[in-house]
Design a protein with these regions (language model features):
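N-terminal signal-anchor transmembrane alpha helix
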Residues: 3-22
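Alpha-helical transmembrane segments of multi-pass membrane proteins
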Residues: 13, 90-97
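Interfacial loop at the N-terminal end of multi-pass membrane proteins
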Residues: 16-54, 73-75, 108-115
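Cytoplasmic juxtamembrane regions at transmembrane-helix boundaries
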Residues: 66-86
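Juxtamembrane boundary at the C-terminal end of a transmembrane helix
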Residues: 70, 135-140
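Transmembrane alpha-helical segments of integral membrane proteins
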Residues: 97-111
């Protein structure tokens, strides 16, 4: 159940980003943190946006493979200690992203008036928190 929930979140996130890589625009306007005027915080990096989405897809696939390895459904040529370390690190980073106060992201963000902030509070941060906890739980 824990593995299935984690893989469902990872699959959803990877599929959405893959859609962006291949030209999709749904959700694009709320895919990056925004300044009070609505412009993306990293507007100077927008030309790399689709390439970056592809990098995230690769990372999410690796996360899914590590989760499957830890659960015993897949064998990778990696030590169990390394798999555990990576999963704990990623899980802790996801939880931290959701709960550590920051200007643009997380439940305790300082800037709450943008469309991005609304999506982050209601969708992104809860998904990061749940996926982080599920990932850590898969290890312990």
């Amino acid at each position: 159940m824990i593995l299935a929930a984690a893989l469902a979140i990872v699959s959803f996130a990877a599929a959405f980003r893959l859609y962006w890589v291949f030209g999709g625009n749904l959700g694009y306007s709320v895919s990056l943190p925004q300044l009070p005027d609505g412009l993306p915080v990293m507007a100077h990096r927008l030309p790399w946006w689709r390439l970056a989405a592809g990098g995230v897809v690769i990372c999410l696939i690796c996360l899914a493979l590590l989760l499957l390895t830890r659960a015993g459904h897949l064998q990778l040529p990696l030590s169990q200690d390394l798999v555990r370390f990576v999963l704990l690190t990623v899980g802790a980073a996801f939880v931290a992203r959701a709960v550590i106060p920051n200007r643009y992201v997380g439940f305790f963000k300082g800037l709450r008036t943008t469309r991005w902030a609304n999506y982050d509070t209601r969708l992104y941060s809860p998904l990061f928190l749940v996926l982080g906890l599920l990932t850590v739980w898969q290890v312990i």
